[in-house]
């Protein structure tokens, strides 16, 4: 027997509220549990990482490279300025070193060369007495170049000359110059001795970077010799002068050169011929054989990169004034046949 029980509206409302409360309580418990989990995750922290090496140094003129970790030495030359610069002065790179003290010492030596004994140094002046005597006979460019050649990152330590490295396979010395016409480097050929490769680098540096290029040997050896009436006699006189210390080792090794390809030899000879005609000493010793030159030497066409150089005067990279400065001394040695040969190319 069933008894019908009438449920009033008030009871229905109470039932609904109780169900709603129970649902809210369950939801609240879930949210609180989630919040507890989130808070626990926030408290988890990874192990502290090693701080990156500081780029600054306690020594003047020294910074640490962010990638290689080597210490680089720089000097600010306040006296250097040209119209293309927005501020006076330029940064002079002195090389990268494995040891911080070595970079600081390189800065001290460069500062002594630029500004003398009264400049501020990293180490006492008494440590550099012998170096001061050595640097007196060199120009700023020569001495800065010698400092860079002693750095840890220069030419992989295989040669004391700039732009020279030893070939891994044949043992000969190869010369390269970097950042030419947008290329990473320009290959200049291989040579029997370091000095020959260094001269090839100097020639290319003067050709592509002008008279301010940093060279291995004094730039006056290539461009600033007076125009002689008799180049052979003048060369013989220069061999006996104290400034001709390059003569014993710039003679080419003809037997070893026979192993090189004909195109590579012509490239090297023509590049040397182009800029060394103004120097009787170097022209005779590097290009010509030990016997007197023939009256009518064989003609050779200029390689492609030098042809491009003669044709790029209007390209904006080289002005007419720069071209005159570099090649102005060569006009007295060039015959009309020389220009006609260039036009035929």
Curated annotation (Swiss-Prot):
One GO cellular component term: nucleus
Single GO BP term: response to water deprivation
Main location: nucleus
Gene3D superfamilies in UniProt: AP2/ERF domain (3.30.730.10)
This protein's record includes keyword DNA-binding: yes
DNA-binding positions: 58-124, 160-218
Subcellular location, record wording: Nucleus
Protein's UniProt keywords contain Secreted: no
Family the entry assigns: Belongs to the AP2/ERF transcription factor family. AP2 subfamily.
UniProt-listed PANTHER family: AP2-LIKE ETHYLENE-RESPONSIVE TRANSCRIPTION FACTOR, AP2-TYPE TRANSCRIPTION FACTOR
Function: Probably acts as a transcriptional activator. Binds to the GCC-box pathogenesis-related promoter element. May be involved in the regulation of gene expression by stress factors and by components of stress signal transduction pathways.
Protein name: AP2-like ethylene-responsive transcription factor At1g16060
